[in-house]
Amino acid sequence: MALVSSRATQDSKPSRERIVPVVYYLSRNGRLDHPHFIEVPLSSHNGLYLKDVINRLNDLRGNGMACLYSWSSKRTYKNGFVWYDLSDEDFIFPVHGQEYVLKGSQILDLDNNSGNFSAVTHRRNQSWSSVDHYKVYKASELNAEATRKLSMDASTQTDDRRRRKSPVDEVNEVTELSREEITSPPQSDSSPETLESLMRADGRLILLQEDQELNRTVEKMRPSAVLMQLISCGAMSFKKCGPTLMNGNTRSTAVRGTGNYRLERAEKELKSFGRVKLEEKEYFSGSLIDESSKKELVPALKRSSSYNIDRSSRMGLTKEKEGEELARANFIPRNPNSVVGQP
């Protein structure tokens, strides 16, 4: 009976395992979680090793959980405590008696592309990892689509700017051409002008038309001849003289013998009104326009017959003298060779 009892005690001793209490902390993003308490069986009679703690954590919290952290133990150093980094085969020294304190710091992986630290995560459930991959894929796809839309919008805006720029350039060119073609603006009726200055201005307009038609026709009068003919026309109405020159006809509508009558008529207008009254308004904007056919002028106030008779009697004495002076000023001797048609 004594031998049986001794053998039973010997068999029971190896079956009894030593278990030590361990307190550990988990550090995530620089913060310590609430402490955890576990009991770790010892694999060696020498004491506790880190591999014993890792095996216990894998059994309790899933395989590979402990590999996500770097472990260190609390040790006394001089008058304080320090964290002592450990590897799998390192021995863990107790703090006081059989008290073990560990800390697990989350391992950080350096991302070479972005230069930032990202935590290494390993999920136990594969379905969650597939969902994460799907989210990442969708996010990347959305980013690519957004980038494509932005590029398309940028190209569209560039095309629109180019399309808008070309009409603006055309409008600017047309505006510049019109400004170059337009001569001095027409003066109002209130500005006093003489008949000679108006005829000279109209003559310059006709000269522009004549210069443009020189390349098309062969037989044309020179600008100097046209100007001389206009000056020699005297007080002849521009409506009668102008169109003949614009049409390229070399024959003038002026008739000899009627010059004195027209001079008297112009003199009456100058004396009665004190300024030139244009019955036919003509402006230049690239071409001659006769606005008399489009607009009707406001009828001017007519003088009474007695007023006209009295005024004509007072001016009768000086009419002939002033007519001769005006004829001398308007009529200039011409060279027959310079003008094709005689006025």
From Swiss-Prot:
The keyword NAD does not apply. Residues 184-194 have a biased composition (Polar residues). It comes from the Eukaryota. Expressed during embryogenesis and in roots. The DIX-like oligomerization domain is required for polymerization, edge localization and biological activity. It comes from Arabidopsis thaliana (Mouse-ear cress). GO terms for cellular component: plasma membrane. 'Soseki' means cornerstone in Japanese. Coiled coil: none annotated. The gene is SOK4. Homodimer. Forms long polymer filaments with other SOKs proteins polymers (e.g. SOK1, SOK2, SOK3 and SOK4) crucial for polar localization and biological activity. Binds to ANGUSTIFOLIA (AN). Residues 148-194 are annotated as: Disordered. InterPro entries: SOK, SOK_DIX, SOK_magnoliopsida. This is Protein SOSEKI 4. Its main location: membrane. Belongs to the SOSEKI family. GO terms for biological process: auxin-activated signaling pathway; cell division; inflorescence development; plant organ morphogenesis; protein polymerization; regulation of auxin biosynthetic process; regulation of auxin mediated signaling pathway; regulation of cell division. Keywords: Auxin signaling pathway, Cell cycle, Cell division, Cell membrane, Developmental protein, Membrane, Stress response. It is a peripheral membrane protein. A motif (Association to cell membranes) lies at residues 233-234. Residues 18-109 are annotated as: DIX-like oligomerization domain. GO terms for molecular function: protein homodimerization activity. PANTHER family: PROTEIN SOSEKI 4-RELATED, UPSTREAM OF FLC PROTEIN (DUF966). It is found in: Cell membrane. SOSEKI proteins (SOK1-5) locally interpret global polarity cues and can influence cell division orientation to coordinate cell polarization relative to body axes, probably by guiding ANGUSTIFOLIA (AN) polarized localization. Positive regulator of auxin (indole-3-acetic acid, IAA) biosynthesis and signaling pathway leading to the modulation of seedling growth, plant and inflorescence development. Negative regulator of stress responses (e.g. salinity and osmotic stress).
